[in-house]
Amino acid sequence: MEGQGMPNKDYKIKPVLYKLIKANPRLKHDETVSQIEQIFRRYGFYTTREYPIYKLKDGSERAGRIDLVARKGKFRVAVEYDHHKLIKWKSFQKIIQIKPDVAIAIAGNGEIESNMERALKFKEIMMCRMYVMTLRDKKFKIIFPKYIKQSTATP
């Protein structure tokens, strides 16, 4: 059941998220991704850096590499880290394209609210369980399914 955002699997990722917010955004991109990778490994995940993704024949998806993919059994997490204030659109596209169980988009120097607004404009976000995190603010929020269900529940 990969890619279905299984809520009962939160126990596998919540402790990791609380450690991830302590990563240092002042380091270079590769050094911060290395910190993130070590955190996943401490929690028993197997990791792959610069995980390749390929463009589909119809050209609807993008080719590139995802900063980090962590796996524990059949549970898969995709992580994209952007050093800037806002998470790039292509980062959202890439992590959603591989249909992970959990996607984590991290902005090194941004504010959580502006990154949440940006993520909510990306309709494909509902394809997996998505967390947005900012290292400067030391905060993370779940976007889907919890946040979208709450925000669409009001008339």
Give residue spans per PLM region.
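Active-site beta-strand-loop-beta-strand hairpin of nuclease catalytic cores
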Residues: 61-78, 97
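Intrinsically disordered, low-complexity N-terminal regions enriched in serine/proline/glycine
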Residues: 17, 42-45, 68, 130, ...
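Acidic-basic catalytic patches of nuclease active cores, encompassing PD-(D/E)XK
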Residues: 3-62, 71
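Catalytic cores of nucleic-acid endonucleases
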Residues: 76-133
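Non-catalytic C-terminal interaction segments of nucleic acid-processing enzymes
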Residues: 2-8, 90, 121-155
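Residue-level detector of flexible, active-site-proximal loop/helix-junction positions
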Residues: 54, 85, 137-139
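Residue-level detector of intrinsically disordered, flexible termini
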Residues: 62, 102-104, 152
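Amphipathic coiled-coil/heptad-repeat helices and related helical stalk/stem segments
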Residues: 32, 64, 87-91
